[in-house]
């Protein structure tokens, strides 16, 4: 099944279901605060595992107690697609287990 870019309305509707996520130009993004650098690093590893499973990868940034990610779909020219929201939902599901807020 081909991946298609989402419309602005579709993006806004999906973002409404993912508090903390926002549209940043041509990508969706979110930052998480964690209790320690080690916890943040562990979350990055967990996100990387999910990305490999989905075969869909974000830009991840690890800071002192913060993990930030931005995601869009390169295969459709860098637009936001359902794949990006699938990854965002998976990250939202794993974040509480790392103590992320």
UniProtKB/Swiss-Prot annotation:
It is an enzyme of class 4 (lyase). It comes from the Bacteria. HAMAP family: Pterin_4_alpha. This is Putative pterin-4-alpha-carbinolamine dehydratase. GO terms for molecular function: 4-alpha-hydroxytetrahydrobiopterin dehydratase activity. GO terms for biological process: tetrahydrobiopterin biosynthetic process. The lineage of its organism: Bacteria, Bacillati, Actinomycetota, Actinomycetes, Kitasatosporales. Keywords: Lyase. It holds the Pfam family Pterin_4a. It catalyses: (4aS,6R)-4a-hydroxy-L-erythro-5,6,7,8-tetrahydrobiopterin = (6R)-L-erythro-6,7-dihydrobiopterin + H2O. Its EC number is 4.2.1.96. The gene is dcoH. Belongs to the pterin-4-alpha-carbinolamine dehydratase family.
């Amino acid at each position: 099944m081909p991946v298609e870019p989402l419309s602005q309305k579709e993006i806004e509707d999906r973002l409404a279901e993912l508090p903390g996520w926002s549209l940043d130009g041509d990508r969706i993004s979110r930052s998480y605060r964690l209790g320690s650098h080690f916890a943040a690093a562990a979350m990055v590893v967990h996100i990387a595992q999910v990305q490999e499973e989905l075969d869909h990868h974000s830009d991840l940034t690890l800071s002192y107690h913060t993990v930030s990610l931005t995601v869009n779909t390169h295969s459709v020219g860098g637009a936001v697609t359902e794949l990006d929201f699938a990854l965002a939902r998976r990250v939202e599901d794993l974040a509480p287990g790392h103590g992320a807020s």
